[in-house]
Amino acid sequence: KVTSSIETIYKMLEELKEQVFEANLQLVKYGLVVLTWGNVSGIDRNKGLFVIKPSGVPYDDMKASDMVVMDLEGNKVEGNLNPSSDTPTHLELYRNFDNVGAVVHTHSPWACSWAQAGRDVNAYGTTHADFANCAIPCARGLSEEEVKGEYELNTGKVIVEEFEQRGIKPEECPAVLIHRHGPFTWGKDPFKAVENALILEEVSKMAYQTEQIASLDNDSNIGIEQYLLDKHYQRKHGKNAYYGQSK
């Protein structure tokens, strides 16, 4: 029975490693990363372990077996390579956002542009409302002390702080920007987290273009009414959601 249990755990981790590997490749497929600028992780909460991309390894050279297994204390459990340098950020999100099953970090250009400007991505239409029920928050930049200290861990702490201060539930807004840095997204699994990174990039682009068009006519009357935002969010994600097919 002990052997069977170990084999089951091993099989589940191998499946998670494959998912995380494939999700990392999706970042390239969807144009969300260049070079090695990005990472995906996924967690098995029952086992208290998560899997993350190795640091600085080109996507073309990666294999599923290269994925690194970590525990929730930040210790490497399995893998020959070093984990992503952003691992402490992922870990802090897993520790604080109980329903998150996977985390993505990219430097996708549209989302990064808003982050570098220190701006929230405001909700201007129903495309955004289908994704989140509020503006995508841009968390504060890190202090010099935070940067010189445990930088990546403190990045995660700033994200958690931002959501707590604004009263935002991570399930209702699966994305955040870090001022002067870039975006993080999350989801129930690695593929959903990547999907959310792709949607964030699209709504970031739309928001910029909306502001540019509105500025031509000095039109400040842009934005989505709360009742319309609520309708679109709830019909897709709410208790009585009816978007899509019955499961």
Residue ranges and their predicted role:
Residues S5-K247:
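Glycine-rich flexible loops
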